[in-house]
From Swiss-Prot:
One GO BP: chorismate biosynthetic process
Cofactor note: Reduced FMN (FMNH(2)).
SUPFAM superfamilies linked to this entry: Chorismate synthase, AroC
Sites where the protein binds FMN: R131, S132, S133, N243, A244, G287, K302, P303, T304, S305, S306, R328
Involved pathway(s): Metabolic intermediate biosynthesis; chorismate biosynthesis; chorismate from D-erythrose 4-phosphate and phosphoenolpyruvate: step 7/7
Origin species: Bradyrhizobium sp. (strain ORS 278)
PROSITE patterns per UniProt: CHORISMATE_SYNTHASE_1, CHORISMATE_SYNTHASE_2, CHORISMATE_SYNTHASE_3
Cofactor(s) needed: FMNH2
Identification of the protein by name: Chorismate synthase
Entry's EC annotation: 4.2.3.5
Length: 361
């Protein structure tokens, strides 16, 4: 199985399966002498960690990260810093329950990657989905914590802005509210609504999708490249690579199709510190290159495929049958995808920053 590596100058290779001994990643391209402690990575991992509320999977994984290589004590300060060599990170799996999946080892779950993995490789890891499981995203969050150190000064944040058909009120957006509820929701009133809404879905054994918004403030103008090295193209690819993501938009996104040229164009004026934009329909990127405005990316996450409702399917022999999925699953996988989206944003920006330095100095 190839294609486990993401990035060009800042490269992340992930490994491991949902029910294997461990998962992890190797980060290549991190500059030397950047202060880095496991506790800094752990902070980001704890935001994504499962089992923290009734609205996420009850699989209990501490997600304790170990730094295996790529760091040492700075000879001048004594602080632990990166060496410039590959950084290997390991997260042990501790709460696998593979027996929950024994009844579906020969059946394909509708909406899941079971069928396509079998079609490509001739077999699949039915125990929690193997590499196709969202368990893999913990390694992305770990890599993203390192990327954040490279892009110090850039603020990357994310929020859940829609669950099912229910959208937040953007006039009530409060970044501080995100840490106060289990949904990463910036709208206090809508977060309270989501509690009852998702409780009903969870108790019925079903699931629901969501829309997440990731922003990056402080990105310098000029980051990115034209044509085949576009910053927005890499961001779209990064977000689409996250499990269960089915759509990505930058700035106004698909809404731009409803605007006139006058409404869509972000007009510019002169300011004391440079150029000032009067709007941000472009989402901070024009021609594949950052404008200096906040970068705004949204992505849609489909409902979790593993649900308790019986569904029609076929088995490996091609026989028609019925399937009911047991195990522990997120009723809305979009909730824990917020830190994952932030991590992918950080990784792309770190990669482009290093590429930018290599091209223009």
């Amino acid at each position: 199985m190839s294609f486990n590596t993401f990035g060009h100058m800042f490269r992340v290779t992930t490994f491991g399966e949902s029910h294997g001994v461990a998962i992890g990643c190797v980060v290549d391209g991190c500059p030397p002498r950047i202060p880095l402690e496991a506790a800094e990575i752990q902070t980001d991992l704890d935001r994504r960690r499962p089992g923290q509320s009734r609205f996420t999977t009850q699989r209990q994984e501490p997600d304790q990260v170990k730094i295996l290589s790529g760091v040492m004590a700075d000879p001048d300060t004594g602080a632990q810093v990166t060496t410039g060599t590959p950084i290997a990170l390991l997260i042990e799996n501790t709460d696998q329950r593979s027996k929950d999946y024994s009844e579906i080892k020969d059946k394909f779950r509708p909406g899941h990657a079971d069928f396509t993995y079998e079609a490509k490789y001739g077999l699949r890891d039915y125990r929690g989905g193997g590499r196709s499981s969202a368990r893999e995203t913990a390694t992305r969050v770990a890599a993203g914590a390192i990327a954040r150190k490279i892009i110090a000064g850039v603020k990357v944040r994310g929020a859940l802005v829609q669950m099912g058909p229910h959208k937040i009120d953007r006039d009530k957006w409060d970044w501080d509210e995100i840490a106060r509820n289990p949904f990463f929701c910036p709208d206090k009133d809508k977060a309270a609504f989501f509690e009852d809404y998702l409780d009903g879905i969870r108790k019925s054994g079903s699931s629901i999708g969501a829309v997440l918004e990731i922003t990056a403030e402080g990105v310098p103008a000029g980051l990115g490249a034209p044509l085949y090295g576009k910053l927005d193209a890499d961001l779209a690819a990064a977000m689409m690579s996250i499990n269960a993501v089915k759509g990505v938009e930058i700035g106004a996104g698909f809404g731009a199709a409803e605007l006139t040229g006058e409404a869509n164009a972000d007009e510019m004026r002169s300011a004391n510190d440079g150029t000032r934009f009067l709007s941000n329909h472009a989402g901070g990127i024009l021609g594949g290159i950052a404008t200096g405005q906040p970068i705004v990316v949204r992505f849609a996450v489909k409902p979790t495929s593993s649900i308790l409702t019986p569904r029609q399917t076929v088995d490996r022999a091609g026989h028609e049958t019925e399937i009911l999925t047991k195990g522990r699953h997120d009723p809305c996988v979009g909730i824990r995808a917020v830190p994952v989206g932030e991590a992918m944003m950080a990784c792309v920006l770190a990669d482009h920053l290093l590429r930018h330095r290599g091209q223009v100095g």
